[in-house]
Amino acid sequence: MPVPQLLEVIAKVNKIHKDIQNSIQEKLATHSVLDEELGNPAYGPATKKHLVQVSSILGLLQEYNLLQDDTCFVELGAGKGKVSYWLAKTLELLRHSSSSVLLVERASLRHKHDNKLDKTDVSVVRIRADIADLLLPEIDTIAKAKHVVGVTKHLCGDATDLALTCLMNCQSSGKDVTGMVMTFCCLHRCHWNTYVGKHFFEHVGINSVDFDIMCGLVSWAVCGSGQSREKRKNDESGLGENERYTQIGLNRCEKETVGKKCKDLINWGRKIYLQNQGFNCDLCYYVNSNITLENVCIIAMKANKEV
């Protein structure tokens, strides 16, 4: 892309971000249901990092009083079901026999946790569906529940926006979507047509072209320089990496900061969207960055619900 256009978007990002800087606070939670598992010496660093994230998600659900009975907990993009497994164990310990867990995943995966899930006392249902086509109120598990709570762990790119839209459509149908805890991933895979924060971006002067550029700049936050992707583009344009840095006037540390600001703004737009739908929201760092660089989550709770 032309360097002047890139610099123009970076200038917009820096200006807009000033209004939200320091608004994303650290909120590191844990849940006792995973204490023993986290202490298992047989697990390596990768497994423990995953468990730390799950523990924080469950801890936040508890802290925000979202672990209530007669609730269907919907894990969107459930993968192999590891989050849902520990969520079901938590509900079992709380003796929430009227609650249920619904796993939604479009892929057919091997080595799922479903056999373990079947051994819990909590009703667990897995459906294979694309979130874009999902009508939650038509699912029996949802229809029977008094409340609905959404959960995601590292739902990729615009799948998060599709999940938010899905949950808000569920609310519009008359179901009580009490709240959600959603962690983000791969913001470079977001798309303007599905992004829920368009109203916020248009209000602050970001258009669809700017948004696409921002999604590219996000890689600077999670890859440092975004070198592999950028190197291919530089090779095609005849620009070396150092020359590209010279033209935009940013070193690697400054580029990483720009990438993080882009991530913050994309997630902030999602927060504003949920607030406009009647939710109180916190955008926070739910684990340390040494656990994962994708360490931001949104916690949303019905505005009339008490913690």
Give a label for each model feature.
Residues 1-307:
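Class I S-adenosyl-L-methionine
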